[in-house]
Amino acid sequence: MTEDKKNQLLNEIAGYFSPTVRHLISLLPGKAVGEMSEIRLRAGQPLSLTVKGENVFLSDGGQLCYLLQSGLYTVTKKDINDTFRALCEFSEYAYKDQLKMGYIPLKNGCRAGIAARAVIENGKMVGIAEVSSINIRLAVEYINCAIPLSKYFSGGLLIAGPPGSGPGQPGGPHLHHVLRWP
């Protein structure tokens, strides 16, 4: 994915973050943004990112740091709660089923993994409480990944699935590549 596309993607998801985290991420250099694949918020721990496959941290001033050190921004419970509410569009109930699976799919192909305490009633998980961390995986574009399949479906292809299993769901990016075939 190009740096411009990654910047656009990051701008789209920026609204989910608490104001402080949003500001720190906005300070990242473009090259780091283009190579970023995850953003991790863990209550009481440094804000961390995966950039070029490496775990890095953000300082209080928005600088990338490759080692644990003083001056790193520590994610607060408020950061977690603000981000979680925004990810759920301020209606946790509307995302009850997704939360039981441990993640929220986002509209742009990203997904947010949620770590929390499970709420169990009569032996069944009915929800979550006390969110302690959020891991946002940024969508990745794989150009031409569906080309090897084209020889099998040259006469046409009907793709069907249950309701809610379309392009906005996990695996959906592969469907987009199939749809772009000439």
Question: Which residues make up each language-model segment?
Answer:
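P-loop NTP-binding catalytic core
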Residues: 90-154
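N-terminal accessory targeting/assembly segments
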Residues: 1-108
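N-terminal start-of-domain structural block
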Residues: 61-85, 123, 137-154, 160
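Short amphipathic C-terminal alpha-helix that caps PH/PH-like domains
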Residues: 130, 174-175
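Short, ordered loop/turn segments at secondary-structure junctions
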Residues: 43-44, 141, 164
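Post-Walker A helix-loop "phosphate-sensing" segment adjacent to the P-loop in P-loop NTPases
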Residues: 176-182
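Glycine-rich phosphate-binding P-loop
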Residues: 153-174
